[in-house]
Amino acid sequence: MNRKMVAVVTAAGLATASCYARAKWVRPEIGTGGDGHTFPGATYPFGLVQPSPDTGRESYRYCAGYRYEDSRIFGFSQTHLSGTGCGDLGDLRLMPFTGAASAEVSSAFRKETQVCEPGYYAVTLDDFGVRAEASAAPHCAVYRFAFPKGEASLLVDCMWGIGGKEITKTILGSDARVEGNRVLGTTRRRYWVTRQYSFVVEFDHPVKSWEKLPAAEGEKAPRFVLKFDLSDGSPLVVKVGYSLVGVDGAEKNLAAELPDFGFDRIRAAAAAEWDRTLSRMEIEGSDTEKVNFFSAMYRLFIQPNNIADVDGRYRGADGEVHNAQGGVYYSTLSLWDTFRAYHPLATLIAADKEDGFVETILEHQRAAGFMPIWTLMGKDNQCMIGTHSIPVVVDWFLKTEALTRDAAPADADKSSVHSRDRAFWEAAYAAIKDSLTKLHKGRKLEDWPALDKYGYYPNDIVTSESVSRLLENCFDDWCAAKMAAKLGHAEDAAFFEKRSRNWRNVVDPETGFVRGRDTNGNWTTPFNPLALGRNAGTGSDYTEGNAWQWTWHVLNEPEALIEAVGGKERAGERIVNLFTLKADESETGTCEDVTGLMGQYCHGNEPSHHVIYLLPYVGRTARQAELVRAVFDEFYVAKPDGLCGNDDCGQMSAWYLFSAMGFYPLNPASGEYVLGAPQLPKVTIKLEKTVGVGEGTDKIHSPTQTRDSNYFRVVAKNLSKENKYVKSVTLNGKPLEGFTIRHEDIVKGGELVFEMTDRP
């Protein structure tokens, strides 16, 4: 394809995007450079597939399979993770080419030939003169490959996958085969989890001939090269049905979503669905602000992914096939990250989805026997610390309880499929209690007997991350205590409330830092509060951070933490110093997840995300306003390397969206948001209000269907580069007392107005 044709195609792509008021602002390439670990390919909101180019696959750099700075594409795989710190997926590689067949086929490409839009990706493969386009449906991918006239070839590679230097050890086997005009089969893989995926690939042109490439030693899955006669100059359209259940599931998905080869129809449908999804919020601001805002929303809604087929079947945590209630079962739950801001934000702008996330979490528990930690394709990889599906469930329970406690019976829709009766929540609480008191098979991250005996995790028993584990578990315990109290389990509530305060046992009064201790109560010595820990097996008391960062991780008791480290004045100085204290690598060591540093504050990793919102507790709101602005200016930039760290399945984006509005859930299960300093003149949330399903003790705390839609507006009057400080705040015309706002006040609708000034 010549340069003139490329320009025409690119212009056509931009014209399509401009038809949609919000999707046109999205730049999927943001985060594909640097440490963002995003990908540029086609997506569908919460969809199972993400057809996207792969420029690499074997290291931390390639968690999403693509680096903006690369110049060669190895093919297009069907599934990708967005913003994670560990790579996986990259299932089923397709690569169009001409000439000699090879498993190593790749092509140079130029960034100026790329078109990246919600639901669409295109690029020119320069080595072959092929224009490649991709789009997505909820469970299927579709491609259009425009070849030079003549014979065209397509590599279908079942030995491909992201993650691991030795792919032969991760692909366990495949029964993939060519049948007529289709390639189909099931491939088994083991990397982050052990799983299987099934697929059906169909073509709009007959297969002229095909061959199976020779397998290298140890390879257990085939690669096929198929040839097509495109002498008439028409493009080759390829559609891919995908399923975790089986080939029959992939066939059903394909028949339901891609009954024909209408590429443009699928592309338009994906763009329209993205625009509808992004319409949950509106903003006023500059073009650059709109790009940053709607790109953050886009990254938010790439996942979790609905892994249930069109008939509702899914493969669960136990490896068995189940039927999903309402036809949805979500995976890619990066809960150590997303419990902090993603899920609280979803309760405001995607309440319908949050209810499904909670249902999925509890279905997972019923199959696996414990609450999930980090789910991928229906399985739990148990990555990271804590059990943060617990705050997600408890937050939803407490918020819907607050909304429904005064609901009249006449408001109830008792036929709603989303009705949650007391039995549902009692079962949820029982699952939470089990997960916080019993060790389950394959789960060795916590030692409950040691915790209950010592009141902390002795680092000669729990030899890695003992302090971080304690702090995270204290928050889970606090959540359990609140749910137990609401359900009337007073004894349990007292137990979990007491245990949630154990963080006090690792605050060293002499240094003012959280610090590891052994079974004799001795503090970790020597002690360097700047030294970075990594993950399990490293021997550090901290997870992906140091004592400077983790000392502030008491989400459930910020006031008590401030007193424990010396009171408001000392704590305030310490927090302010956190953002200016610089240290040499010789003092800190290294950790690849510790990025986006501002002093010792680490915006590129989640444990620091709430710290700016501690500043009102110590009377430092002016400094808070300065820091929010600095983070926006430095760490959220509308370019490929514009994210300062892994987007972590939308958590980094959720921080941006909350902070743009001027509030943030410091305690993400409290139903309370701490005020900050808004960064946009106006943000409007289109609300979905939920109501209860009945009176009495049998039907309580129940989110149901959408009652009506209304709006909550956040206005920042006189906001400018200079006017970054908050002078006053009103809610619906009345002065807002304190520095927090309740969830129920937001979802009632109304207007939050910040008067901005240039004076601290």
Give residue ranges: language-model regions.
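Charged/polar low-complexity intrinsically disordered segments
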Residues: 527-531, 696-699, 705, 709
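ATP-dependent phospho-/nucleotidyl transfer catalytic cores
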Residues: 476
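Serine residues within intrinsically disordered or low-complexity segments
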Residues: 18, 415-419, 702, 709
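Accessory carbohydrate-recognition regions in carbohydrate-active enzymes
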Residues: 20-391, 397-402, 418-471, 479-505, ...
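Short, low-complexity, charge-dense intrinsically disordered segments
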Residues: 405-415, 419, 694, 698
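Hydrophobic h-region of N-terminal signal peptides that target proteins for export
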Residues: 11-19
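Bacterial N-terminal signal peptides that target proteins for export
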Residues: 1-7
